[in-house]
């Protein structure tokens, strides 16, 4: 991967229709896994004008009120009246959830707990870089913080004319592999009909952009695009249909690292699309935190029903203190990347998933985000002899 001199990433708010769908899917997963940690869950959501549809496959011994969960998530996000364009209290909720296929269950379950088979084939990537304190790429990190700030101002009525739907985009200039300046910022936010565009631009600039982005990165040639098409009154599921799993680059590294293609939300941890991507982040972050490399990307792959990964690869893009092959050997020695091993390593059978469904799965803080720990860094450093 060559060095970029300019790089752009984007994020979307919790009120974006695709993120609404992700949050509904993960709220359902949380409700089920809270009472049945061994449940198998794969839930997809679609939201469109006046309607939410949930579909997928579930195997569980517990009961949850799916309609109530759907409505609660929509209302919590802020879609609570026809004035906003969508009302969680009155929208239709259609349920098309069925049972998990017996063929899939056989491949995953008919092994010992230690040798739990992967829920599907696939390839997953994890990534970390030392360009931010949380070891995330700066463009996606700051894109998340912009829309997170928009939601804070909206929910606390600091800017009461804000509505739930919003998008951000940050373009950074790099020198010697480090971000040094903001070249462009895009912030589009839904709003009430009665606010002036000039007031929106001023408030977004002062309360969101300047509040979030490092002052020293802003310069006289920075481009600011605030609601560049003009008014943004119609948004959310009225403006666009929302689907689970349609913001996989927003969910991960903003395009800075490769992606295996599998989405996360609505999937229990037996699905390696999710759990192995989390483990990949954990591995890469510990490698960077240990000082073994300034940036690291790990790829891991699986076959359905097989516990051992079919491959583990490491790329430090020329920043490694030791060879990538030696780091890959350390990964195999210090991390159990079998499905059961990584579930136990990261304690993934918990109701921790809805918070991941907005503002990124990585670079977050708090006990729920166990894949963000750097508790293996010292052991890796010692084993590498650096």
Curated annotation (Swiss-Prot):
Function summary: Catalyzes the formation of S-adenosylmethionine (AdoMet) from methionine and ATP. The overall synthetic reaction is composed of two sequential steps, AdoMet formation and the subsequent tripolyphosphate hydrolysis which occurs prior to release of AdoMet from the enzyme.
Gene3D superfamilies: 3.30.300.10
Coiled-coil residue spans: none
Organism this protein belongs to: Hahella chejuensis (strain KCTC 2396)
Bound cofactor: record note: Binds 2 divalent ions per subunit.
Chain sites annotated for binding K(+): 44
Binding residues for ATP: 16, 165-167, 240, 246-247, 263, 267
Flexible loop: annotated segments: 100-110
Lineage: Bacteria, Pseudomonadati, Pseudomonadota, Gammaproteobacteria, Oceanospirillales
EC number: 2.5.1.6
EC category name: transferase
Cofactors (names): Mg(2+); K(+)
A single cellular component GO annotation: cytoplasm
Family: Belongs to the AdoMet synthase family.
GO molecular function: ATP binding; magnesium ion binding; methionine adenosyltransferase activity
Catalytic activity: L-methionine + ATP + H2O = S-adenosyl-L-methionine + phosphate + diphosphate
Pfam families documented for this protein: S-AdoMet_synt_C, S-AdoMet_synt_M, S-AdoMet_synt_N
Summary of subunit composition and partner proteins: Homotetramer; dimer of dimers.
Protein's UniProt name: S-adenosylmethionine synthase
InterPro entries in the cross-refs: ADOMET_SYNTHASE_CS (IPR022631), S-AdoMet_synt_C (IPR022630), S-AdoMet_synt_central (IPR022629), S-AdoMet_synt_N (IPR022628), S-AdoMet_synthetase (IPR002133), S-AdoMet_synthetase_sfam (IPR022636)
Subcellular location: Cytoplasm
């Amino acid at each position: 991967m060559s060095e970029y001199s300019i790089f752009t990433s984007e994020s979307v708010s919790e009120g974006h229709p695709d993120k609404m769908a992700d949050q509904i899917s993960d709220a359902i997963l949380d409700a089920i896994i809270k009472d049945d940690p061994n449940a198998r869950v794969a839930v997809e959501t679609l939201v469109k004008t006046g309607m939410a549809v949930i579909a997928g496959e579930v195997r569980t011994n517990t009961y949850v009120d799916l309609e109530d969960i759907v409505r609660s998530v929509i209302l919590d996000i802020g879609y609570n009246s026809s004035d906003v364009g969508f009302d969680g209290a009155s929208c239709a909720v259609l349920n098309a959830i069925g049972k998990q296929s017996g063929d899939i269950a056989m491949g995953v379950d008919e092994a010992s707990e230690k040798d739990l088979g992967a829920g599907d084939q696939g390839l997953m990537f994890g990534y970390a870089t030392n360009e931010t304190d949380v070891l995330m790429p700066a463009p996606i990190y700051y894109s998340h913080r912009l829309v997170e700030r928009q939601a804070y101002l909206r929910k606390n009525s600091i800017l009461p004319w804000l509505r739930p739907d919003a998008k951000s985009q940050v373009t950074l200039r790099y020198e010697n592999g480090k971000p040094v300046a903001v070249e462009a910022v895009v912030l589009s936010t839904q709003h009430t009909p009665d606010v002036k565009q000039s007031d929106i631009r001023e408030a977004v600039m002062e309360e969101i952009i300047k509040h979030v982005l490092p002052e020293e990165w802003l310069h006289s040639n920075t481009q600011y695009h605030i609601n560049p098409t003009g008014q943004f009154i119609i948004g959310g599921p009225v403006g666009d249909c929302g689907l689970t799993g349609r913001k996989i680059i927003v969910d991960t590294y903003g395009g800075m690292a490769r992606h295996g293609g599998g989405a996360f939300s609505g999937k229990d941890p037996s699905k390696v699309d999710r759990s192995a991507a989390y483990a990949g982040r954990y591995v890469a972050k510990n490698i960077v935190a240990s000082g073994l490399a300034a940036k690291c990307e790990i790829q891991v792959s699986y076959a359905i029903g097989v516990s051992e990964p079919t491959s583990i690869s490491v790329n430090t893009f020329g920043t490694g203190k030791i060879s990538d092959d030696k780091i890959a050997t350390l990964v195999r020695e210090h991390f159990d990347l079998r499905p059961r091993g990584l579930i136990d390593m990261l304690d993934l059978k918990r109701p921790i998933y809805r918070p991941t469904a907005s503002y990124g799965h990585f670079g977050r803080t708090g006990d729920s985000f166990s894949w963000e720990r750097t508790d293996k860094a010292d052991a890796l450093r010692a084993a590498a002899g650096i």
